[in-house]
A protein has these predicted regions:
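Metallo-beta-lactamase
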Residues: 115-182
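Short, acidic/turn-prone active-site loops that include or flank metal/cofactor-
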Residues: 27-28, 44-45, 68-70, 81-85, ...
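Core dinuclear metal-dependent hydrolase active-site scaffold
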Residues: 1-33, 78-138, 153, 204-207
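Binuclear metal-ion centers of metallo-dependent hydrolases, dominated by the metallo-beta-lactamase
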Residues: 5-6, 74-87, 108, 136, ...
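Active-site metal-binding motif and surrounding structural segment of the metallo-beta-lactamase
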Residues: 26-71, 139-144, 166
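Short amphipathic alpha-helical segments and helix-helix/interface helices
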Residues: 12, 50-57, 113, 135-136, ...
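Active-site regions of enzymes building and remodeling cell-envelope glycoconjugates
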Residues: 35-41, 61, 73-92, 141, ...
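Redox-cofactor binding/interface segments in oxidoreductases and associated redox assembly factors
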Residues: 23, 39-40, 93-97, 145, ...
């Protein structure tokens, strides 16, 4: 399953199921294949892009997000924390994503992460979040974790999450772009800190 997850840069991912799932598409190329499902975790401009959703959206595409996302993008179906939806062979559950140490992403804003259960694997996309008590309930096979800090997990925080969740694979996100706050060196430092606890996949940027 790990080879069917493609990092598109920043917080954007493509999961090739079926169904075809995009998470937070931003600055993506237009595709001849419409998404089956598009997941939007927060209402930030770099995660909630109307233009990018429209590039990927077809007549039957389902877009899921919180109430703030609904205010920015037309025809978004509401997904609440711990609510699960099923599409084809995938189950998608909303997970609270928020800051504790700072007010960058307050819990009241309703930010989401996602647990995507597909082909007998549980994939956890953390979103913009620090370590939260809700993570105690998640034991994924694959974890996608930010490492850029700024109200979300930084490298030490992401390492602590891996120690708590024990995933088999981890993909660091939110690094390498201009103004990102985390670099390839940070991604490598994260991999070194994880050691043998999990397999860390440092993807090549597609843009």
């Amino acid at each position: 399953m790990i080879d069917r997850i493609q990092w598109l840069g920043h917080g954007s991912f493509l999961i090739q199921g079926p169904p075809l799932i995009y998470i937070n598409p931003w600055r993506v190329a237009s595709s001849t294949f419409h998404a089956d499902v598009i997941l939007i975790s927060h209402d930030n401009y770099d995660l909630c892009s109307v233009a990018d959703v429209n590039k990927l959206r077809g007549e039957n595409t389902i877009v899921l997000g919180n109430e703030a996302v609904q205010e920015q993008i037309d025809d978004v179906e509401l997904l609440r924390p711990w609510q699960a939806r099923t599409f084809d062979r995938a189950s998608i559950k909303g997970i609270p994503a928020y800051s504790i140490k700072s007010m960058r992403y307050p819990k009241e804003a309703g930010g989401l992460g996602f647990v995507i259960s597909l082909n007998f694997y549980d994939i956890y996309y953390a979103g913009n979040t620090e370590m939260t008590p809700e993570m105690e309930r998640i034991q994924p096979d694959i974890a996608i974790l930010p490492i850029n800090g700024d109200g979300a997990l930084d490298v030490p925080g992401a390492v602590d999450v891996v120690k708590k969740m024990h995933p088999r694979w981890v993909i660091p996100s939110h690094w390498g772009s201009v103004g990102e706050g985390a670099t390839r060196e940070d991604a490598k430092a994260f991999k070194d800190a994880i050691g043998g606890r999990a397999t860390v996949v440092i993807s090549e940027q597609t843009r």
